[in-house]
């Protein structure tokens, strides 16, 4: 399993903290940017990069961060097959992973979430395979 990371300037330092935590826990990741703090960067660029990477690598997840998490979630969810979810509590993470098979976790840097607990829940929670959940997930990809 691999995790693709992305963040704009408001999420940059949270992303850097996440990278350190992932490395300390021997979890493979790829940083899709921004690589340096740039107060003028744009969140859609990094959300697109993470969404494309997750779609191309079926055994992966994404983590996106911006100030509120709203912008990166909106951008990522424009991609068919991406199910990006904004979560602030571990129970929300478990619910969206199990019921919705979320594949990108969106974090609000302005709220300084307890990101280790959220990431652990995201990684550890499998998607349920019940027909009703799969039916609903399939409907997300309809036009």
Language-model features: locations:
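Short active-site oxyanion
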Residues: 2-3, 59-62, 81-83
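N-terminal beta1-alpha1 ligand-phosphate binding loop
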Residues: 2-21
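C-terminal binding/interaction regions
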Residues: 4-6, 10, 90-143
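Residues at secondary-structure transition points
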Residues: 9, 13, 38-41, 45, ...
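Short helix-loop-beta junction
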Residues: 20-28
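A short beta-strand-loop structural module common to alpha/beta enzyme folds
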Residues: 28-39
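Short, structured active-site "lid" loops
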Residues: 45-64, 68
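Mid-chain, well-packed structural core segment of small domains
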Residues: 64-109
């Amino acid at each position: 399993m691999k995790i693709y990371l992305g963040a704009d300037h408001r999420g940059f330092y949270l992303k850097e903290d996440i990278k350190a935590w992932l490395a300390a826990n021997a979890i493979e990741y790829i940083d899709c940017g921004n690589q340096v703090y740039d107060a003028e960067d744009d969140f859609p660029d990094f959300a697109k990069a993470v969404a494309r990477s997750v779609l191309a690598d079926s055994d992966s997840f994404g983590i996106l961060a911006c100030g509120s998490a709203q912008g990166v979630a909106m951008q990522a969810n424009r991609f068919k097959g991406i199910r990006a979810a904004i979560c602030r509590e571990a129970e929300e993470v478990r619910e969206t992973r199990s019921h919705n098979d979320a594949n990108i976790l969106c974090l609000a840097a302005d709220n300084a979430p307890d990101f280790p607990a959220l990431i652990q829940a995201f990684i550890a929670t499998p998607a349920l395979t019940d027909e009703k959940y799969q039916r609903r997930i399939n409907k997300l990809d309809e036009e």
